[in-house]
Amino acid sequence: MLAQFDVNLVVLLVLLICGLLSQNAAVTIAAGVLIVIKITPLNLIFPYIQAHGLNLGILILTIGVLTPIASGKLSGESILKSFISFKSLVAIAIGLLVAWLGGRGVKLMSSQPDVVAGLLIGTVAGVALLRGVPVGPLIAAGLLSLFIGK
């Protein structure tokens, strides 16, 4: 009986419940979709999701971030002013730092998969309990890489 116990499915169910209790749609939908994929023949797409999911997620996030520029909601004048405002210059510097940390995070997660579980648990807890957004694993891994020197 214990051989049939799927710890990964239980973890997904716990995440689904956490998402529901915290009213976090992102965690709820992600866990629900993954549960459906896991318990159906769709589980054959897991290698594809694992290979391309992160890049697809980053692409969708980038499209979302750039949409105000494309739609004109953020005017060209506002964009140009961002290069003369102190607050905007600090924002640009922080954006550069975060992008660099994210790059380090991707490398660390690829080279040291043993840290991925901890990063994911921390990120999901932050999303579910602190109403954060699930961009944390890359930045968290980037920060971790600074601490462990990788």
Curated annotation (Swiss-Prot):
HAMAP family: UPF0756 (MF_01874). InterPro entries: UPF0756_TM. The keyword Transit peptide does not apply. Belongs to the UPF0756 family. The chain crosses the membrane at residues 1-21, 51-71, 83-103, 115-135. Disulfide bonds: none annotated. This is UPF0756 membrane protein AB57_2455. It is found in: Cell membrane. One of its GO terms (cellular component) is plasma membrane. It comes from Acinetobacter baumannii (strain AB0057). The keyword Membrane applies. It is a multi-pass membrane protein. Keywords: Cell membrane, Membrane, Transmembrane, Transmembrane helix.
